[in-house]
């Protein structure tokens, strides 16, 4: 992409209601803009990031043997009444009527719809296990939408549902999805913890949450720095009467609090703030029994499916990545999530030598399937550089006055360090860095 053709409306000021870094920088960097309360449009850069995250999620799920589907965003209220969740979801579930006064729901999740899809289509234990997922729009009518993409009303979510002939097989799939989720978040370059959690309105006997560690997180966790142990304080009896008090404390305040007990590995435990980006549940027969979704076992007996459900906040991950990776200048995207991993910046577009080299490197990187943007605009160098830091391209290749001596600069967004390299070896150096 040439910057002169790209729609990237950057801004100097953040919205007045933006308090979190991700909200400020995603709007200022031209990734998103607000359509209404808790409703956001994804602009070209934001859409690229969203699709890159979606691609990682899809690739790992497909490798784990999951099947992608796409369900209707609108579901009949009758499904929710039969499962008993039409009341449990409360006002977060937005109901609508069609011209015939039939009542529908803008789906906040899809357990009921997925059970209805499988019901009478999967009838034998021989067809199990089965894991179906979608990456689709959801809507929850949040009372106080805030924090940009972290607490919106409309969002993109991956929701998956597995069907089994036994509890043991359901637990096996639950464990497989836990490992698959770990692979997804690791590929995205995130520091995260898996913690025991409360099942809430979804229901079921066991659940785990996946939290990106960030100072701005709404949840308070107890984590061990020596092993992978983590727990949401909501699940620990010792802290249940202090949940509101601890959740309201800042990360700096939590750092000063001491936890008396040790981790099972012998190391000290610490409070951390987390942003929930994934949640997996062991549902048992809660939904299949309520919706009379049965299969025939090896003895010909009719039984309700054992189920589990698995969710990832795909659009929430866009914000969570920046909450964990930013500085005072703007976004710092991880390599897997960056809209463009290389930004070629020509300091003076009127200089034929600079433009010629820029065009040559741009063509070579595109031929090598590198996600590259070529800043061929006539803006001042300082303006271009500030925009590059705000947007957060991992590497900016600067072609400027040093070219007279045969050199170009490569700026690393994460370290903010620049190196000078021979212009003839710039391509090879970039390819080495982005591996």
From Swiss-Prot:
Keywords: Aminoacyl-tRNA synthetase, ATP-binding, Cytoplasm, Ligase, Nucleotide-binding, Protein biosynthesis. It catalyses: tRNA(Pro) + L-proline + ATP = L-prolyl-tRNA(Pro) + AMP + diphosphate. One of its GO terms (cellular component) is cytosol. InterPro entries: aa-tRNA-synt_IIb, aa-tRNA-synth_II, aa-tRNA-synth_II/BPL/LPL, Anticodon-bd, Anticodon-bd_dom_sf, Pro-tRNA-ligase_IIa, Pro-tRNA-synth_IIa_bac-type, Pro-tRNA_synthetase. It comes from the Bacteria. Its EC number is 6.1.1.15. PROSITE patterns: AA_TRNA_LIGASE_II. Transmembrane segments: none annotated. GO terms for biological process: prolyl-tRNA aminoacylation. The keyword Lipid metabolism does not apply. It holds the Pfam family HGTP_anticodon. It is an enzyme of class 6 (ligase). GO terms for molecular function: ATP binding; proline-tRNA ligase activity. The keyword Aminoacyl-tRNA synthetase applies. It is found in: Cytoplasm. NCBIfam families: proS_fam_II. Belongs to the class-II aminoacyl-tRNA synthetase family. ProS type 2 subfamily. Catalyzes the attachment of proline to tRNA(Pro) in a two-step reaction: proline is first activated by ATP to form Pro-AMP and then transferred to the acceptor end of tRNA(Pro). Homodimer. This is Proline--tRNA ligase. It comes from Sulfurimonas denitrificans (strain ATCC 33889 / DSM 1251).
């Amino acid at each position: 992409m040439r910057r002169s053709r790209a729609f990237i409306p950057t801004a100097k000021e953040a919205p007045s209601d933006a308090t979190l870094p991700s909200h400020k920088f995603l709007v200022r960097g031209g990734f998103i803009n607000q359509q209404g309360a808790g409703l956001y449009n994804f602009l070209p850069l934001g859409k690229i990031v969203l699709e890159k995250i979606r691609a990682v999620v899809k690739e790992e799920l497909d490798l784990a043997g999951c099947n992608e589907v796409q369900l209707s965003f609108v579901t009949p209220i009758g499904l929710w009444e039969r499962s008993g969740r039409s009341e449990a979801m409360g006002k977060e579930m937005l109901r609508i009527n069609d011209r015939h006064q039939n009542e529908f729901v803008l789906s906040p999740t899809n357990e009921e719809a997925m059970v209805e899809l499988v019901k009478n289509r999967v009838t034998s234990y021989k067809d199990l296990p089965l894991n179906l997922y979608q990456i689709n729009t959801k809507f929850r009518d949040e009372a106080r939408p805030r924090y940009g993409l972290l607490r919106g009303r409309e969002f993109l979510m991956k929701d998956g549902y597995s069907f089994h002939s036994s509890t043991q097989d359901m637990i096996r799939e639950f464990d497989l999805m836990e490992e698959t989720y770990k692979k997804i978040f690791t590929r995205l370059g995130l520091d995260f913890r898996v913690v025991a959690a409360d099942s809430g309105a979804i229901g079921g006997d066991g659940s785990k949450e996946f939290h990106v560690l960030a100072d701005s997180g709404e949840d308070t966790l107890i984590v061990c720095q020596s092993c992978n142990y983590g727990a949401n304080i909501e699940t620990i009896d010792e802290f249940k009467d202090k949940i509101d008090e601890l959740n309201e404390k800042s990360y700096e305040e939590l750092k000063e609090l001491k936890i008396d007990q040790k981790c099972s590995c012998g190391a000290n435990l610490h409070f951390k703030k987390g942003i929930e980006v994934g949640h997996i549940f062991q549902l048992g027969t809660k939904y299949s029994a309520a919706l009379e979704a049965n299969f025939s076992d090896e003895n010909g007996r009719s039984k309700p499916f054992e189920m589990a459900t698995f969710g990832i906040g795909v659009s929430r991950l866009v914000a969570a990545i920046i909450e964990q990776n930013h500085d005072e200048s703007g976004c710092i995207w991880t390599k897997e999530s960056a809209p463009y991993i290389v930004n070629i910046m020509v300091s003076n577009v009127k200089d034929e030598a600079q433009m010629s080299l820029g065009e040559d490197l741009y063509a070579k990187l595109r031929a090598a399937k590198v996600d590259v943007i070529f800043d061929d605009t006539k803006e001042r160098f300082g303006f271009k550089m500030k925009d590059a830091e705000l947007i957060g391209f991992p590497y900016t290749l600067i072609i400027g006055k040093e070219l007279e001596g045969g050199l170009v600069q490569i700026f690393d967004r994460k370290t903010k360090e620049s190196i000078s390299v021979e212009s003839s070896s710039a391509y090879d150096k970039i390819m080495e860095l982005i591996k």
